Swiss-Prot record:
Organism classification: Bacteria, Bacillati, Bacillota, Bacilli, Bacillales
GO terms classed as biological process: regulation of sporulation; sporulation resulting in formation of a cellular spore
Gene3D superfamilies, sorted: Helix-loop-helix DNA-binding domain (4.10.280.10)
Name of this chain's protein: Aspartyl-phosphate phosphatase YisI
Gene: yisI
SUPFAM superfamilies linked to this entry: BAS1536-like (SSF140500)
Role noted for this protein: Aspartyl-phosphate phosphatase which specifically dephosphorylates the sporulation transcription factor Spo0A-P and negatively regulates the sporulation initiation pathway in order to control the proper timing of sporulation.
Length: 56
């Protein structure tokens, strides 16, 4: 997951440099990165809860 996030982050930067910050291409990349980051956060929260429950 980390490599996908890093790849999308680089793509976002390159897209913003090429098309501008407010272009539809940049916004699309930003939204895709948001999805990856939100998924990562949810996974960490679920995994963290699993670890807490397994210690009981």
């Amino acid at each position: 997951m980390n490599s996908k996030i890093e790849e999308m982050r680089i793509t976002l930067i390159e897209t913003a440099q090429k098309y501008g910050m407010n272009s539809k291409e940049t916004i699309q990349c930003s939204q895709e990165l948001d999805i990856l980051l939100n998924t990562r956060i949810k996974e960490e929260m679920i995994f963290g809860r699993y670890l807490e429950n397994s210690r009981m």
